[in-house]
């Protein structure tokens, strides 16, 4: 029995099916590293192991990240992007302390899938000042955008201090969070509350000093700026004296 011909309209259209977004190879590599870090010592994880776990050729891995330290920097970026994807608009009218509390908790939520690996890596990092310094640069860049997303100034005279303070606050809270397995995270939130109080007191004093020394800074700028015109006036006066004894030809 002959089959009826299939109508062109009834044939499946591959283009109509929604295409899944391509996997981010950088995220694949970071997640592979964190899986390995959860079960192995940091110094036992080779680059070839990471490439195999991530399912990428070693040559591609080299193009994505030059080192394991750079992969940790990649984790900082992934977490930062996740926090920025959220919204802090509902906290816009809240005090700075509440906005910081929200940022830290959302950052910890974004770090939660990598907690097992971070727990093993953290002691190694703490023993290496150069690694701490390198990771601090990435954390500063990440927190600059975190604070900006919460409406906290980062580009004024004290902006750099606020950003670095947020990085240090996050580091101190993370020490407790890594060992806090309670669903409510009561120990973590208690530590965060204490650190926010301390940071608030420090920033209040710094802002007071900055405000009180504003007249002195203004005077110093006026003195520094005032020297240059005097030098220029003196140079012009000397030039005039020289010109009095010279016979200049008319311009051609």
Q: What are these language model-derived features?
A:
Residues 2-9, 179-252:
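C-terminal peripheral helix-coil segments that are non-catalytic and often amphipathic
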Residues 2-36, 40, 48-49:
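Basic, helix-initiating cap at the start of DNA-binding domains
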Residues 2-4, 36-74:
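Helix-turn-helix
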Residues 28, 49, 102, 120, ...:
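Amphipathic alpha-helical interaction segments
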Residues 37, 69-79, 83, 121, ...:
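Alpha-helical DNA-contacting segments of helix-turn-helix folds
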Residues 74, 88-123, 127, 137-138:
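Hydrophobic alpha-helical connector segments
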Residues 129-152, 160-174, 190, 198-200:
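Amphipathic alpha-helical packing segments from all-alpha helical-bundle domains
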Residues 152-157, 176-186:
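Inter-helical turn/loop segments and adjacent helix faces that build the functional surface
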């Amino acid at each position: 029995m002959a089959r009826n011909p299939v109508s062109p309209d009834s044939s499946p259209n591959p283009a109509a099916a929604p295409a899944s977004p391509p996997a981010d190879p950088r995220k694949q590599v970071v997640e592979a590293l964190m899986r390995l870090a959860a079960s192995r010592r940091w110094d036992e994880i080779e680059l070839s192991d990471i490439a195999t776990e991530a399912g990428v050729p070693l040559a591609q891995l080299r193009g994505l990240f030059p080192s394991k330290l750079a992969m940790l920097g990649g984790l900082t970026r992934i977490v930062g992007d996740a926090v920025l994807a959220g919204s802090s608009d509902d906290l816009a009218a809240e005090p700075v302390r509440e906005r910081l509390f929200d940022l830290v908790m959302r950052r910890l939520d974004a770090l939660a899938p990598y907690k097992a690996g971070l727990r093993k890596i953290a002691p190694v990092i703490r023993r290496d000042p150069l690694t701490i310094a390198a990771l601090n640069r990435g954390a500063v860049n990440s927190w600059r955008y975190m604070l900006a997303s919460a409406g906290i100034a980062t580009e004024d005279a004290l902006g750099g201090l606020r950003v670095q303070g947020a990085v240090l606050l996050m580091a101190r809270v993370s020490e407790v969070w890594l060992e806090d397995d309670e669903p409510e995270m009561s120990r973590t939130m208690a530590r965060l509350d204490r650190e926010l109080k301390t940071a608030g007191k420090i920033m209040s004093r710094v802002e007071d000093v900055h405000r009180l020394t504003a007249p002195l800074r203004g005077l110093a700028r006026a003195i520094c700026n005032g020297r240059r015109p005097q030098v220029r006036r003196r140079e012009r006066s000397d030039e005039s004296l020289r010109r009095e004894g010279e016979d200049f030809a008319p311009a051609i």
